[in-house]
Amino acid sequence: NFLEMLKENCKLLWKRQKQKFRIPMPESLCQILKKKKQ
């Protein structure tokens, strides 16, 4: 499922960002990311 993959990618991406910058995962930004890829 492509959408599920996108969701997982989003999560992984933010996990990486969190480790880099030590910031909480912004859900809204995740949504924007998904919209851009659609």
Swiss-Prot record:
Q: Quote the protein name from its UniProt record.
A: Toxin CSTX-16
Q: Does the keyword Disulfide bond belong to this entry?
A: no
Its keywords, alphabetically, are: Amidation, Secreted, Toxin
**Which GO terms label this protein's molecular function in UniProt?**
toxin activity
Name the protein family.
Answer: Belongs to the cationic peptide 04 (cupiennin) family. 10 (double chain) subfamily.
Tell me where it resides: Secreted
| Principal place of residence | secreted
Q: Which domain of life is it from?
A: Eukaryota
The reply on keyword Metal-binding is no
How is expression of this protein distributed across tissues?
Expressed by the venom gland.
| Any one Gene Ontology cellular component term annotated for this protein | extracellular region
Residues bearing PTM Glutamine amide: 19, 38
